[in-house]
From Swiss-Prot:
Species, as recorded: Candida albicans
An annotated GO cellular component: cytoplasm
Gene Ontology biological process terms from the UniProt entry: nucleocytoplasmic transport; protein transport
Encoding gene, per UniProt annotation: NTF2
Presence of the UniProt keyword Methyltransferase in the record: no
Name of this chain's protein: Nuclear transport factor 2
Alphabetical list of Pfam families matching this protein: NTF2 (PF02136)
InterPro entries documented for this protein: NTF2 (IPR045875), NTF2-like_dom_sf (IPR032710), NTF2_dom (IPR002075), Nuclear_transport_factor_2_euk (IPR018222)
Function: Facilitates protein transport into the nucleus. Could be part of a multicomponent system of cytosolic factors that assemble at the pore complex during nuclear import.
Transmembrane segments: none
């Protein structure tokens, strides 16, 4: 049976950003020990270190607004590559910050986990 990679990517991103915005300390189940996050210039490996980094970000409230979401199959094994652009509203700031994020999703017992995650704010 063929996987609708666009639907999986959209569902994953909606879940990920809703969880991030409500309680990012609970994102650990989406990562594994071999997962890697590049957040701006910091590189971290492993679910524990990744969640520790995300939970320690210096803001209380955040809201992600997705502008674009593109997905492609990334291997014959069902991996999915996802590219997201959007805006972040942080704490009480009125001006949103633009961001880009890439996820490499790996199938895992009927679900997916994040193997690679690259996040970058876009300043311009």
């Amino acid at each position: 049976m063929s996987v609708d990679f666009n639907a999986v990517a959209t569902e994953f991103c909606n879940f990920y950003y809703n969880q991030f915005d409500s309680d990012r300390s609970q994102l650990g189940n989406l990562y594994r020990n071999e997962s890697m996050l590049t957040f701006e210039t910091s590189q971290l490996q492993g679910a524990r270190d990744i969640v520790e980094k995300l939970a320690s970000l210096p803001f209380q409230k955040v809201a992600h607004r997705i502008s674009t979401l593109d997905a492609q199959p990334a291997s014959a094994n069902g991996d999915i590559l996802v590219m997201v652009t959007g805006e972040l509203l942080i704490d009480e700031e009125q001006n949103a910050q633009r961001y880009s994020q890439v996820f490499h999703l790996i199938p895992d017992n009927g679900s997916y986990y994040v193997f690679n995650d690259i996040f970058r704010l876009n300043y311009s």
